[in-house]
Amino acid sequence: MPDTVSNVVSNATFDVAVIGAGPAGLAAAARAAESGARVAMVDDNPRPGGQIWRASRTPEPWLRSQVEVFSGARVFAAPEPGVLALERSHSNLELRYRSLILATGARERFLPFPGWTLPNVMGAGGLQALAKSGLPINGKRIVVAGSGPLLLAVAKYLRGHGADVRLIAEQADSSAIFRFGLGLIAKPGKLIQAAQFRAGLLGIRYLTACWPIAARGVERLESVTLQRNGKTWTEPCDYLACGFGLIPNVELPALFGCRMSETGVAVDDYQQTSVAAIYCAGEVTGIGGLDLALVEGEIAGYAAAGKPRDAGKLFAARKSNRQFAGALERAFAPRAELRNLPQDDTFVCRCEDVTYARVRQCSNWREAKLHTRCGMGPCQGRVCGGALEFLLGWKPDSVRPPVLPARVGSLARPG
Amino acid sequence: MPTLRLRVDGLPIDVPAGSMVSAAVAIAGASKFRTSVTGQPRAPLCGMGICFECRVTIDGRAHCKSCQIPCEAGMEVETDA
């Protein structure tokens, strides 16, 4: 049945438009609204909260009645300065703004290995998101693998909902994590969180310097083969929850021409990007966790609403959280051996089913796209991009609209 | 907890209100959400609208990302479209 899609041009101009309703976006919208700005918040999920606060009541302290929330809406283009083109399920919208805050967050880094395309091999955050969305996991045997503190949070959540978490396989060495642990002593709040985590994880094997090398099964996952200290063994399981840390969602800032840094989008003290009146906050500027995302969001919100003095009062808090982020990145950096995970016949691009052998014959992203269609499918390189950056050192190509697949009708502007 | 009923590949499924379509497909027992261009079974990877592996047909509308769409009573969901 053909859809009726209406194209709507919003008459209102917002002082501040916030893209992303995770912690950074919510904090930004709240502070901007409190400062007297007319604020719109846009998010592609059905409800505000982002991934970390998915299906929870935690965002409520940050939700302000003055903020106009556009949920289930995707930004797919910026047709002219000060205008965003949004696609919703049955309508399109053009939204006008004076300042823009991009709080697009992060996604998991996936690394290809044999069998990673089997049903029930998911991201670590991916499986948690699905469980929060109603997937029953009670009694399911789950291996949690990859890297970073997210694995612990996910394992704790899954176990708390009745799953049989067989083990956590962390690719980093115990020495690196130990050094990171020592760094926590300077942050009492983080230490308390760590202790609470340990209590929830009691009895789950936590193996460092361990990673999955293959997932096996016919129609769906049946077991995962793991490697540690040169030994391999196979764990039968129903789900593999596997993610190798987080990478920032920089596609939208790139579309606006924002300059990048080593860690994400480059910003100044006020979270402003290289483009005037466009701010970035949270994981998109570099992976740093919840506390950093909130304080960056607050700073961006004040600054975008014309309250730089209020923003400046938060610089010290941001600095200490950034130090924590740096320690985190060093401790959980992916080890070089993980570059050997994909075999010749392993698909790297899951949208177009392009093997590692074919991609590796190319010398850069552009060539791979033209010759193999790698990165040309619906996800537009969001999954294989993070993998190939690690495997082959390829930096992402330029971003062109539409930044995500959009309906043909959405691309034709009214009038 | 209130539940609602929808159909996945013709099979009636009851899910808690607030569940996403992806959960309903999994509850229905389907491990395959879609078939890849070389014929492989695929199912959700990222759970958050990035990977497009969770695509299904909802009420005749193809390529819907089931991880981001809440279940509604009476929905007709088809996998492997």
Task: Pin down the residues of each PLM region.
Chain A
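Glycine-rich dinucleotide-binding loop and its adjacent helix/turn
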Residues: 106-143, 147-154, 262-269
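Beta1/beta-strand and adjacent pyrophosphate-binding region of the FAD-binding site
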Residues: 11-24, 140-145
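A conserved FAD-binding loop/helix module that cradles the flavin
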Residues: 281-316
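A Rossmann-like FAD-binding core segment of flavoenzymes
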Residues: 62-88, 95, 161-251, 261
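Active-site-proximal substrate-binding core of FAD-dependent oxidoreductases
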Residues: 272, 302-341
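N-terminal Rossmann-like FAD-binding beta1-loop-alpha1 element of flavoenzymes
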Residues: 16-38, 154-158
